[in-house]
Amino acid sequence: MIRKLTLALLLTLPTIGVAIDLEGFYITPKGGISKSMDTGVTVGDTGGGQFDIKDNDLGTGSVFGLSIGKYITNNFRLELEASQRGGLEYDTEYASEPNLGTTTKADIDTKSIFINGFYDFESFTISSTSVTPYFGGGVGISRNKMGTTTETTPDQVITDLDGNTLSQFSYKLAAGTLVSLTESLSLDINYQYVNLGNFKSGLDYVVVSGGAGSDTLTEALNGGEIKTQELMVGLQYKF
């Protein structure tokens, strides 16, 4: 999705430039490392029985995005950002009977759209290079996909549970620095905390090893919240 959006935006920029004045606008492709935080102790329900699932983080993944923004004043700017996170994995186990010791694994992927606002502080110079610190945040919507969930009991009975995708309210807080490279191009380095909302499994499952059968859960497996700390690097080009 991000690649298609990036290509579409780049192809339409010349046309947009003819139609409107691009002064004050900027574009920022970016990428970075996404380190997840604990999702929280959650409760599973399979056919009427509830049990605790151990607190778990989703490991470390990657994040890529593209922002298009506009300087409203010399210090305040707004932007629309599309981003995608991958490489995260739900990997935990049940912490209570009757499924004590059963492991649960699933790949996690998220796509999000944010509206961000940033305040740029006064610039200062280091070795003839202009540096501009900033802080801000954003709100948006994320599409959180939990892939096929594989559960393995201590007796090696393996069950696959359908994946699911949820739309969730998301928010972020960020602080960073713009390092001027040319009059129009700046290196954008920032740290951000992002809460992407909840993720859950589907309801249908099938036993794939150590037994036979299929059924439907009375309640989806609740994985908890996707919360990440991210270090991002981008290139801001001002028109």
Regions found by a protein language model. Give the residues of each.
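Transmembrane beta-barrel strands of outer-membrane/channel proteins
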Residues: 29-35, 80-84, 135-141, 177, ...
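Cleavable N-terminal export/targeting peptides
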Residues: 1-23
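Short loop/turn motifs that connect adjacent beta-strands in outer-membrane beta-barrel proteins
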Residues: 19-24, 75, 123-131, 181-184
